[in-house]
Amino acid sequence: MIVPNRPYTYSDFTLSICSKCLRKVEAKIIYENDCVYMLKRCMHHGMEKVLISTDIPYYQLCREFIKPSEMPHRWNTPIKYGCPYDCGLCPDHEQHSCLSIVEITDVCNLQCPICYAESSPKRTTWKDLETIKRMFDTIIKNEKEADVVQISGGEPTIHPQFFEILDEAKKRSIKHLMVNTNGIRIATDEAFVKRLASYKPGFEIYLQFDSFEEETLLELRGRDLREVRQKAINHLNKYNISTTLVAVLKKGLNDHEIGKIIKWGTEQKCVRGVTFQPIQHAGRTENYDPSTERLTLSEVRQEIIKQSEFYSENDIIPVPCHPDSLAMGYALKMGGKITPLTSIIDKNVLLEGERNTIVFESDEELRNKVFKLFSLNHSPQSGFQGLKDLLCCLPKVILPSGMGYENVFRVLIMKFQDNYDLDVRSVKKSCVHFVTTDDKMIPFDTYNLFYRDDKESYLETLREEIIR
């Protein structure tokens, strides 16, 4: 007897949330038409089918990039309602804070149509220095020694106590300090940039850089920022302040510029890499339709491979601590030549040991500008302030004498989940966390859905339903 088949292949089971009411729902992971989808059903709002990946082999590869979890030194909240309603961090979480975000204001000198924080000139909150110091202390209590702390906003550079805040951060055990900025003050105030340079080493600018096109910038940022960005980069190049370009991506708007942004970044003295961040359906998302304009991590990865002159399919790989949401590629900048490194690294090197470290030793191939993976060292001592101070979940690179951080270029994809594609398996491994004023560390994905501003009042409603 011939029996009917499903139009898809069942892969796995997980928990998600309804995109409309945010209640927890069961979800299937399926393969259909060379793509990965999440099928979920809410008893109030019915079925949803969400695209998770456009690359089944890569999705399956992510399942292999797993490593033992690295824990914080304490937990901030108990387990009571279940993920994602207990943030955080609760004892059910599976990753410490690789990147801790401290928002020092919600005031901004732009009102971007796309902004997960909903910042604007109309907002009024400036956190005072004592509050911010307590937020730094929360990080240190959790981490003992923090890998990366990002000062964010709003626009942090317009905070009246900005440099005092940086001074307080530098007093603490923080390996790498980063400032997330739209670049306006950096472009217009060279004395400000000169003072920023005094915080090197272990200091970096995370510079908003979405497009080279006026219409795109108007849609994403509400203003043509091309001249501002160029002036900002000129100042950062002049003082050689390590910079990561961060591009928010919207399908059909600026995803065709991925290769151009990478190439331009490699040509700048100060730029150490580019981070691509597909829009998360959270906060202010004007003129954005998540049903047609959302980008998956796999689509961004495929565009990098397609558009970049440097990176091939083997060069952009999952980040072991959070493979569903992070992918990376390293390259070496030498004499104007870009040489990808990731494809020559055995994936087992990325997965072994408590702290991933890749050591490149000098040999004949190196002298010929070809680097060879030589050994694994779990407790490296680097002669320069370099890649070891970046996201701890990325492989660390010790380069031979005479080479430094400025010789390494990295591409990173950060795909934060939202009410459509949230998967509790992935949320539990989130390593990018917001610091709150009440001594909590909350994953980026869940913070913008449940915990930011007035959203927690609705979360309380969901929690009450669970314990009835």
PLM feature spans:
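Generic domain-boundary/flexible-linker signal
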Residues: 29, 53, 123-126, 160, ...
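Radical SAM enzyme core and accessory elements
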Residues: 1-81, 330-468
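A short, flexible beta-alpha/helix-coil linker loop
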Residues: 118-122, 212-215, 281-282
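Glycine-rich, histidine-containing beta strand-loop boundary motifs that form or position
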Residues: 104-106, 116-119, 153, 181, ...
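Short, solvent-exposed loop/turn segments at secondary-structure junctions
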Residues: 45, 212, 250-252, 281, ...
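Radical SAM/AdoMet-radical enzyme domain recognition
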Residues: 133-150, 159-278
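Radical SAM enzyme [4Fe-4S]-AdoMet core and its adjacent flexible, acidic
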Residues: 220-226, 238-403
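Conserved alpha-helical substructure of the radical SAM core
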Residues: 34-58, 63-198
